[in-house]
Regions:
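Gly/Lys-enriched N-terminal cap/neck module of very large, oligomeric protein machines
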Residues: 4-7, 11-145, 149-166
Length: 171
């Protein structure tokens, strides 16, 4: 679950911190209030495309940081597969320092590639805008949602059933 967003020197934002609560969080406001800028900041932190003109005018660098609260076993496995250590308190911090023409991505303080952040972010967050509900039309997404809902114990059972099936098929 996304706990907080920290943005510094991006577009019109000098520096801001947004804390998110349990459950559903909704961004509302008048046109031009900055809702899209906040969502764009999240996308940047998740490895989205960065252009130099996204920096606040007159600034050399910017920063976007996301803090997630997550103790899901799949996440810990993914971190280990990337040679990264999960934090002791169950948080995952994704950060991206943006400067003229380049950026530095980090997961829990370790420098990583934008591709690695994108891979990890698939386990952390799902952002939907207007008319973006089409992901529910993909059968693969159905299984991902059901597997996430069922939990780790079910995944272990499904793995055992699969192994037994392959044993029987080999006979």
């Amino acid at each position: 679950m996304l706990r907080s967003l920290h943005v510094k020197n991006l577009a019109l934002i000098r520096e801001t911190e947004v804390e998110f609560g349990e459950g559903l969080n909704i961004l509302t406001g008048e046109t031009g209030a900055g809702k899209s800028l906040l969502i764009g900041s999240v996308n940047l932190a998740l490895g989205g495309k960065f252009e130099k003109d996204m920096l606040r005018r007159g600034e050399e660098s910017g920063l976007v940081e996301l803090v997630f609260d997550c103790e899901e076993p799949r996440l810990a496995e993914k971190l280990k597969s990337m040679d990264l250590e999960p934090s002791e308190d169950g948080t995952v911090i994704l950060s991206r320092k943006l400067s003229s023409g380049k950026s530095i991505c980090r997961i829990n303080g370790e420098t990583v590639t934008a591709k690695q952040i994108k891979e990890l972010s698939e386990l952390l967050i799902d952002i939907h805008g207007q008319h973006e509900h089409q992901s529910l039309l993909h059968k693969k997404k159905h299984m991902e949602i059901l597997d996430a809902y069922a939990g780790a114990e079910f995944a272990k059972c499904a793995e055992q059933v699969g192994a037994l099936y392959h044993e029987c098929a080999a006979l």
